[in-house]
C-alpha cells in the first residue's frame, strides 16, 4: 500500500479514540476461550523465527459483507462496552477494550490473554460491543471474526485511554495531558524511498494479566511483513510521562534497503518557520492552505531533537516541503532522539478543539549501544492536517540481509517534556522570510533565517560575547548578527542565505559559541530554494 493512502486511513481511524462507554450494570463476561497453551517470550521468538523461515502470506483483507457495507458514521457508532472489557470487574489496575473490524481496518488481529504462563485466545463476542446506530446485524458475522486492535485504560480513570494499538504496526499513547497526537510503530521498511513503502503488521497480541497492584502492563506482539518477522515485548507504565520499554527481535526474510528502528510518525502542516509562500513552491496545496487557514500554526510536533553519542545536542525544526525529502544525521551510539512539541503556548495555535499545545512529545532512548548508523528524518508534502507527513527513525549503517537475526531494545517516553534536555541554550523559535536590508534595493535573491535561543548561560549576567557559527552545504551567507532578546532572556541569531543556481535542498547549521566553547545546541535545517527567485 502507498504511504499516503495508509496514513490517511490511520488518521481517520484514530479519530475513534474517544472515551469508553459508561459501564452498564450487567456482569462482565469472560472473553477468553477455555483452551490454553504454554507461553513465554522464548516461545514467541521461536514462532517469529519459524514464520520468517517460510514464505510471506498476505493477510486477508476481505471484510464480511455486512461490515464492508458500513460507512464512516455507521462504523464510528460502534463502541466497546466497558463492562465487557478484558479484566472488567476484577479489581485489576488495567483493562483492555477492543476495536471492531470495519471501514479501513479489514485484517483481523488475534488477541490472547496470558496468565500463569498459559495463554488463551480472546474470542470475538458481539456482547463486547455496543453497535450504536450502525444497524449491523452481528448475528450475520462469523464467530471467529477477530478484532482490529485494542486500547488500554486504567483503574485510576477507566473513561480515558492511556494507549492504543490500531492499524499495521502503529500505536499511540498519552501522558499527563491526556491528549493523543503523534504515533510510533513497530518497524519502518523503505520509508522515504521513491517507491511504495512496506508496512509490517502486528498480527497477534498477548496481553499479560497484571498483578492487583502492578503499575506496568506487559504486552507481547508478533510482527509480520514480506521482508521480516519479529517478536516484540512492550512494558507500558502510565503517568505524567507514559513510559514504554520495547524489546524487538527481528528475523529477516529478504534484504532490506532501508530499515527503520523505533520509527516515530507525526504531522507538521505549518509553523512560524514555514508559513511564507516563497518558502517553497508557492503553487502547492500546502501553501494555499496556510494562506487561507485562520490558525497561526498546525502541527503535532515542531522539531526533531537528537542527543548524539558525542554528547552534541541537535534541534532540527520540522517543515512541510514542496516534495519528498530526507535528511540523515550520522552517529555512533546515539543517546536518544525524538519528535517534540516544544511550543506549548495555546495562543500560537488558537485551536480549542484539538489542542495542539497539549500533543505529547515522544523520546527514544536506546537500551543498549546501537553502534553506527543514522537518525533519519523524512518529510513529505501535506495539504491538510489529516496526513501524518513526518517520520523519524534509527537506520543501522549495515543493511540487513536474508537470514539475519537482529535485536533492539529502547524506551519510549510520551509526555509534555522529554526525560532529558540539553544543559545548553535551546532553540525556542525559528522564522524565515525574504532577505536583504529593509529600505535598500535588493540586487539578488536571498532568504533570511531567524533563530531564537534561550536558557543555559544566555540569561546569566556578565556572560561572554556570543558568536554565531554557521555552516551551509551550498550557497553564500551574508548579513550575520546575534543580539540579546530581552523578552525571552536569550539571543536572536540572524543570517541571509544566497542560494546557488541549484534547486536541491540546502543543509544549514548554526551554533552559538564563546570562543571554541558551545553555548547552545546545534540548530540544523534543510531548505529548498524556490523556483521563483525574483527580487
From Swiss-Prot:
Q: What is its main location?
A: periplasm
Please give the biological process terms from Gene Ontology that the record holds.
Answer: beta-glucan biosynthetic process
Q: Which keywords does the record carry? A: Periplasm, Signal
For this chain, the family text in UniProt reads: Belongs to the OpgD/OpgG family.
Q: Does the keyword Signal apply?
A: yes
Q: What does this protein do?
A: Probably involved in the control of the structural glucose backbone of osmoregulated periplasmic glucans (OPGs).
Signal sequence annotation: 1-28
Q: Looking at the record, which segments are called Insert?
A: 275-287
What Pfam families does the record tag this protein with? MdoG
Output the PANTHER family linked to this UniProt entry. GLUCANS BIOSYNTHESIS PROTEIN, GLUCANS BIOSYNTHESIS PROTEIN D
**Compartment(s) where it occurs, according to its Swiss-Prot or TrEMBL record:** Periplasm
A GO molecular function held by the record: carbohydrate binding
Is Lipoprotein among the key words of this record?
Answer: no
Q: Which cysteines are joined by disulfide bonds?
A: none
Q: State any GO CC term.
A: outer membrane-bounded periplasmic space
SUPFAM superfamilies reported in the protein's UniProt record:
E set domains (SSF81296), Galactose mutarotase-like (SSF74650)
| Pathway the protein contributes to | Glycan metabolism; osmoregulated periplasmic glucan (OPG) biosynthesis
Post-translational modification note: Predicted to be exported by the Tat system. The position of the signal peptide cleavage has not been experimentally proven.
Query: What's the protein here called?
Result: Glucans biosynthesis protein D 1
